[in-house]
Every structure is written in C-alpha cells, then in structure tokens.
Amino acid sequence: MRSTWLQTFSGKQFIPLAPTVEMICVEDIAHGLGNLCRYSGQCREFYSVGQHSVMASHVITTLDGFLRLSADERRLLQLVALLHDAPEAYIVDVPTMIKQHLPVYKEIESNVMRTIAQKFNIDFALFSHPLVHEADMTMLATEKRDLMGPEPAPWIDMPKPYGGHIFPMEPKKAKQTFLDRFTELGGKA
C-alpha cells in the first residue's frame, strides 16, 4: 500500500493532499528549508532555502515603499517574506520552468501555503504582496551574482542585487537562524 503522508523532523504526520494546522510546526519548516538546497543543488556551494528566506526577510526592509507601511505591517511583511517558501519544507521545490506545467503541484503547494498562513494567523493574500515578490526577485539576482557560475544564456529580467554578499551557512546554522528570525519577528509557534 502506498503511503499518503510523510513523517516530519518533529515526528508529526504530514499529509500533503490534506494538510491541517495541527500538522504544521515552525521547527519542521526551519529544518526542512535549512536542509533544502536552492537551484536544484546547482549553485557553486550548498545554499539553503532557509538562508534564502531569512535573507529575503531582511532585504524587504530595503525596498522602496517599505518604510511607508505601519510598524505592524512592516513586521508582518518581514514574517511573510521569511515564510514565502515554507511549503517547500514539506513538498520540496520544483524549478519554476517545470512547475508552470504542473497545475496539480501548484494547487497542492497553494493548499499547503494556505494552511501555513492559517497556522501562523497570516492573511494568505499577503504572500502575493508586491514587496514580498520584489524581495524574492532581489534575492534571485543576488544569488545569481554570488552563487552561480557564468551564465550560458540570459536569465529573466531582475532587479539590482542586494548590496551585501551571501556567505552560505551550514544547514544547522540556517535552521537556527530561521528559528531566531521567526521569534524576532513575533512569530507564534
């Protein structure tokens, strides 16, 4: 018989096709993202989705329009930027050029994201906020500059890279940095 669930780091049973808030745990998200390499592992050295997420939560603070938001809105958008790839902790990442041909995967990913949003009391629509997207794209440009080899063909149009440079973390450090940032932003486990 085929299994319809996976066991998480914390020992929970996670059902990707029917997730519930009880199945979601920030430590599982941090653990999964800390161990998941960006770019299908094709970067020059291991660089986790967890570290990418932490950096996106910082980069968003540098974007035009961020400071015009209220303090509560700024904190919340930083938390959203931190969690924007959280479903990948449970269902891994599928490269964008493939994902666009997998409508069922996109539906599963959306359902997992909705459940994560509900778990952490976040409006699901905020995951589509333009500043969150811009932070993600700024990280893409920065990662391209710092972590990828010479390009064989032009990439998509991207904003300017972030001014700082990326120094990849080991998975355990990425996990702990994610958890620390979650707490710093007022996330409630």
Short names for language-model regions:
Residues M1-A189:
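Metal-dependent phosphohydrolase cores
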